[in-house]
Amino acid sequence: MSFQRIVCLTEETVETLYLLGQEHRIVGVTGYAIRPARVRQEKPRVGAFTSADLEKIKALTPDLVLTFSDLQAEIAAGLIRAGIEVHAFNHRSVAGILQMIRTLGALTQCTDQAEALAAGYEARLTALRATAHPHRPRVFFEEWDDPIISGIRWVSELIEIAGGQDIFPELAAEPLAKNRILLPDAIPPRAPEVILASWCGKKVVPARIAARPGWQDVPAIRAGRIHEIKSPLILQPGPAALTDGLDAILAALWGPAA
């Protein structure tokens, strides 16, 4: 079955369908959708990430609504009770992002385009993994500042692909942010050489990070290597993370020419 009227409640599915040339199927989007920029003018907004206007969605008569994980379970349940087909993605890894692209291709009968898109990303990731680095800098990714939360799995994987070392790899596999909460004194002993921060849409303040008690001798603080990566580029498990998000990590680790 090829779905013709799709509502996307996550940013990454919106971007993916546009990249596949299937934007004509989209009848509604999350309020956070900004990629590509023209989506703001082209598609009606039907809610935020953990809330949605069910009546507005129903009025659009979708034959499919795309959601993400347990975070949107209540929304999905309401849609299902209304008789609307729902597909819930639950990916949190680079491999999962690539599978999401291929699944969207299958749902819209454009498997060739989806395979080409995913294969292109895979080729670049493979090439980057094979790049030799004389030193792999230790990297701390801060997903939130209060409490401090370390990076989710796909972010950790992209740091490794870019040539860095995630200093909390044991936490990256934890899907829930509450299980990646850190006390401030847990970071200095791991001596990150680069700090990447993306505070879920809130502006990162490097001076606030640098001023944390006990952090003054952290190598990244002493070297001034605190870099913000905008949340839409790295915290959505989709094409943005594999392109602009990865590019931002590369630039932070190796300079703008990387």
Locate predicted features.
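N-terminal ligand-binding lobe of clamshell/alpha-beta domains
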Residues: M1-A258
